[in-house]
Structure formats: C-alpha cells, structure tokens
A protein has these predicted regions:
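N-terminal binding-site loop/beta-alpha segment at the start of enzyme catalytic domains
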Residues: 1-70
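Short hydrophobic/aromatic-enriched beta-strand-loop microsegments
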Residues: 69-72, 155-163, 233-240
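Conserved, mostly hydrophobic/aromatic
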Residues: 6, 18, 46, 59, ...
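A cross-family glycoside hydrolase active-site/sugar-binding cleft signature
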Residues: 17-19, 47-49, 73-75, 103-106, ...
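Short glycine-enriched loops at secondary-structure junctions
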Residues: 22-24, 51-54, 78, 140-144, ...
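Structured C-terminal cap/extension of enzyme domains
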Residues: 37-39, 43-44, 170-252
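A short acidic, amphipathic alpha-helical/loop segment
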Residues: 58-62, 148-149, 172-176, 201
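Glycine/proline-rich, positively charged
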Residues: 26, 36, 79-172, 178-185
Length: 252
C-alpha cells in the first residue's frame, strides 16, 4: 500500500486510516481490541473528536503505549476560547498524551483567521507554540468554506467529505490542496453508507496520491476489510469502474 505524506505536516502514513467516531458505540473491551488490531495491522493514523463521547478515551486505553508510533487527529467544536482550552485539556487527558498531531476546528461554519475578532485561530497558534498541537487543521461540510480555508493558507490539513459520488468541485478542492501542499483527509468515503463495495470505494481514493481516507469502524469484520487493502490494494479496473459508474447513475 502507498505511504502518503499529509501535506507539510511531516506525517507519513499508509493511505488507510481509522475513523474513531463509531467506536463510541462499542464497550471498552471491544473498542480496545479493534483499535489495537488496527495498529497491529498497519494503521497508524487515528481520527477522533471531543464530540465523539468516549472515543478519545478508548484510543488512550488502546494505544497510549505506542503513542510515538502513531498519529492522532482530534477536533474541537468550541464556541469560544475558554471552551476550546477546556476541550484540548480534556482531549489530552482522554488520549493519555501531551500533544496531538493535528487539532482541527470541527465542522467549521467559517474560515477562522487571525484578526477575525474571535481569537480562536490565535489560540490554536498558542497551543502550537506550547507544543500541545503540532498542526492546525479544519473540517467542514460546506464547499465554499472549504475553498476559502484552502485559499487562506492558514491550515495544514482540510478534512472534507470525498467519495466516488463527489462532484467536480470536490475533485478541484483536492487538487487545490495538492497545489498548496496541504493535507487532504477524506471523511465519508463511503458516502454515509450509500457505497457498499469497499474495494470500489478504496480504488477511487487510491487514484489520488494526496488523499488520506478515514474509514469509520466499529466491528472487527469492517476492520478486516480495510486491513486486507494493506496487502492487496484495490486499484481501479474494469469491474470496479463498472460498479462506480452504476452507483453514480443510480445515486446522483
């Protein structure tokens, strides 16, 4: 499997990452088992959020002893600076670490920037100076906000929905990130469950050498599907191209 460099973050990881939102639905033992097997199977990038109830705690339980071998991205949906300070403090405690590799504004309604009056971006920079945050990222669902964030040059990573059901504007966003050496993290690479063929989903993503997909995983059988891609990486062929085109016709 391809190793990708996530923009200018210094993060190099297999193009196959763990989305930890669903493990909040698992009991501790199940979650720890799945997370540990993901790491042992070769996954090194784990994405979570303060909003995902106990997801961060489960990552801390499962992976704190291999912290230096993995990359952790988490998120804050804080509405003000004081709340963001509390969020980061709680996240670090839950994750059993003193830093996160990427700290992301969660579902940002706008492009936070220095001097915008909120003080939010300046606080992120302060976290970074203190060594608690290594890279500043942002996640959003609105393409216009995403484009503004990329064009601003303020962020190390962009997390945005991206799958083979995405349109040309989303593909252009990926290209913009590549041009600016900005990491692109693909959420919802299964289009919120509309895509059922994991090989077709992966084969589409594999065409983009700057895109890191995060797969939401809560069952071991799901994990084993994605780990199978480590050894036998799906590439777009006639069969998978047919599945992709059929889904596009049906679901567009």
């Amino acid at each position: 499997m391809r190793q990708i460099a996530l923009g200018k973050t210094g993060i190099v990881t297999p193009q196959n990452a763990f989305g930890a939102l669903p493990v909040q639905r698992c009991d501790d033992d199940t979650a720890v088992n799945i997370l540990r097997k993901a790491y042992e199977g070769g996954m090194t990038f784990f994405d979570t959020a303060r909003a995902y109830s106990d997801s961060e705690k489960k990552i801390g339980l499962a992976l704190s002893d291999v912290r230096k071998e993995i990359f952790i991205a988490t998120k804050t949906g804080a509405k003000d600076k004081e709340e963001m300070k509390r969020h980061l403090e709680t996240s670090l405690e839950n994750l059993k670490t003193d830093y996160v590799d990427i700290y992301q504004f969660h579902l940002a309604p706008r492009c936070f920037a220095p001097g915008d009056g909120s003080g939010m971006y300046e606080l992120m920079e302060d976290f970074k100076r203190q060594g608690m945050v290594r890279n500043i990222g942002i996640t959003c669902h609105k393409i216009g906000v995403a484009e503004e964030c990329v064009e601003s040059g303020l962020y190390a990573t962009m997390q945005f929905p991206f799958s083979y059901l995405s349109g040309e504007r989303e593909k252009k966003l990926v290209a913009m990130c590549k041009e600016r050496d900005m990491g692109f993290i693909a959420m919802k690479a299964l289009a919120g469950g509309l895509i059922s063929n994991f090989k077709a989903a992966y084969a589409f993503i594999e065409q983009f050498d700057n895109v890191l997909p995060i797969w939401g995983i809560q069952r071991e059988e799901e994990l084993m599907q994605w780990l199978s891609c480590m050894e036998d990486t799906p590439a777009k062929n006639e069969e998978l191209a047919g599945i992709i085109e059929a889904d596009r016709r049906e679901l567009d």
